[in-house]
From Swiss-Prot:
This is Uncharacterized protein MJECL14. PANTHER family: ATPASE DOMAIN-CONTAINING PROTEIN, DNA-BINDING PROTEIN-RELATED. Keywords: Plasmid. Belongs to the archaeal ATPase family. GO terms for molecular function: ATP binding. The lineage of its organism: Archaea, Methanobacteriati, Methanobacteriota, Methanomada group, Methanococci. The keyword Ribonucleoprotein does not apply. It comes from Methanocaldococcus jannaschii (strain ATCC 43067 / DSM 2661 / JAL-1 / JCM 10045 / NBRC 100440).
Length: 314
């Protein structure tokens, strides 16, 4: 298996050129100028061991050729298709992973066609028509996920896979694993305390356990919660004082109160404008398949409940 992973989170995308830059990684070992010759040599050098590339390997002369093309999108897609077909003929299954795909949502190609639409059509041709690759499109933007899920060109051609927080049992096992790795003594009470603050979000669990090696566990957890509470309070103050005017303060408070006793709610219990605002602010997460809204994390949920206790103080 050969995996190509495009990570775009750290880049700013404003044009097709930015997308091409993110797709490819310069192959320093090749100065080949002909696409066909390079694909043949690259395929020949691939072995049966699992390989992971952060970007598709390409010689600089060929990449320069892409940038010189007016309709570079067509040439780029053709190169990827021919490369994957060549690998497939050798018995190697390419896996194409595109992360944070929402970054290219507003880019249009030279002909005025949205890049995202062309990309989806191309990916469908790789998977459902030619069967030469597996493709995973990742995003942390749940509004974008909803948009993609409802996109007509993907209907019946893509599966929605939710990468969710761990359940409690898995969370406790993950804590045990990290504790052993870090030579940290965690009691059952410690693990229950951690879960009560951060739930099953892996990165939060990892951070807490790493910090607890040098600090008091409850101090670490209390600081994390205070930080989330502070950010939420400041946001509400800006809304109430009209420094943020895109939503009504009363509507936001009403929306947050829906989570006072519930971690998950039906998305239609909240008005669309407030829902989109809270999702964009990374306070809420939308599961478009289940039509469920929930806080971005257990920690955020705890912050919401803490803020609601003193909501009249604003």
């Amino acid at each position: 298996m050969l995996s190509f992973m495009l990570i775009s989170e750290s880049m700013i995308f404003t044009s097709m050129d930015n997308f091409v830059e993110a797709l490819f990684e310069i192959d320093e070992n090749s100065k080949e100028k002909k696409i066909k010759s390079y694909i043949e040599s690259f395929t020949k050098g691939v072995n049966d061991i699992i390989n992971l590339y952060y970007g598709i390997k390409i010689p600089e002369p060929i990449l320069d050729k892409f940038f010189g093309e007016k309709e570079k999108g067509g040439l780029v897609f053709k190169f990827i298709r021919d490369l994957f077909m060549s690998l497939n003929k050798k018995g190697v299954q390419p896996v194409f992973i595109l992360d944070e795909l929402q970054m290219i949502k507003d880019i249009v190609m030279n002909g005025g066609k949205p890049l995202l639409k062309s990309l989806f059509q191309f990916l469908v041709s790789l998977t459902k028509e030619r069967h030469i690759a597996h493709v995973f499109c990742l995003s942390s933007d749940s509004l974008f996920i909803e948009y993609v899920y409802n996109a007509g060109e993907l209907e019946g051609r893509a599966k929605y896979l939710l990468v969710d927080d761990f359940d409690k049992e898995t969370s406790l096992k993950f804590m045990d694993f990290l504790a052993v790795e870090g030579n940290i003594n965690l009691t059952n009470e410690d693990k229950e305390l951690i879960y009560s603050y951060v739930g099953g979000k892996a990165k939060d669990i990892k951070y807490v356990i790493e910090e607890s090696k040098f600090k008091d566990l409850r101090e670490v957890l209390d600081f994390m919660l205070k930080d989330e509470v502070s950010k939420l309070r400041k946001l509400l103050v800006k809304i109430k004082t009209k420094k943020i005017a895109e939503v009504e303060y009363e509507n936001v408070v009403k929306a947050l109160k829906l989570f006072k006793d519930n971690y998950e709610i039906n998305e239609y219990l909240m008005d669309e404008n407030t829902k989109e605002f809270l999702i964009k602010r990374n306070i809420l997460f939308l599961n478009p398949v289940e039509e469920i809204l929930k806080p971005q994390s257990y920690l955020v949920w705890n912050a919401i409940k803490r803020v609601l206790q003193n909501i009249n103080d604003f």
